């Protein structure tokens, strides 16, 4: 069924395992509390005493106030207000400007994609092959996995040990390095 939701791509039908990376923007409050609790202990264990109070206060500001402010959603209205606020603040100092509800969705998916990349590198380190798939029916995938409304499917990764050259259709094509890299 997962293979069908992935548009019957060969990698899904030949893979030993399929890993689906899911975003949960709806859990931002509990995740922020979890990270804040962890960071308080982390600072107490690893920071000099004279710096602990300020570092804990900084984490409380970020995870207790800023994260809930950035990730809260309400029919696009909160995102619009954040955009107006950042435009005003941005007149006087540098500020992160990607704060609309759509922007925050992109941030969540980008963070999840970085976790997926780390997963694929770790799998390669253990001798396994991976194939990330972006072509899939996200609505069907959510239904198959019984994911809640607030969840989003970020990426599907086929995993296993390659069977020779099966599944390899030809040479890889890549954009030239100097077309995507610019030294500043």
Regions found by a protein language model. Give the residues of each.
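Acidic, surface-exposed loops and disordered segments
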Residues: 1-184
């Amino acid at each position: 069924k997962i293979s069908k939701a992935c548009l019957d791509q060969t990698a899904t039908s030949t893979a030993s395992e399929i890993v689906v990376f899911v975003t949960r923007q709806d859990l931002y409050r509990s995740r922020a509390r979890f990270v804040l609790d962890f960071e308080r202990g982390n600072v107490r264990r690893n920071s000099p005493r004279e710096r602990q109070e300020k570092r804990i206060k900084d984490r409380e500001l970020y995870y207790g106030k800023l994260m809930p402010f950035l990730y809260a959603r309400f029919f696009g209205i909160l995102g619009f207000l954040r955009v107006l606020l950042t435009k005003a603040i941005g007149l006087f100092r540098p500020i992160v400007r990607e704060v609309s509800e759509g922007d925050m969705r992109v941030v969540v998916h980008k963070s999840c994609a970085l976790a997926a990349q780390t997963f694929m590198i770790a799998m390669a380190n253990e001798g396994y092959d991976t194939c990330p798939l972006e072509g899939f029916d996200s609505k069907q995938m959510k239904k198959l996995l019984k994911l809640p409304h607030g969840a989003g499917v970020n990426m599907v990764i086929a995993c296993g040990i390659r069977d020779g050259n099966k599944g390899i259709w030809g040479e890889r094509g890549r954009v030239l390095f100097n077309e995507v890299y610019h030294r500043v």
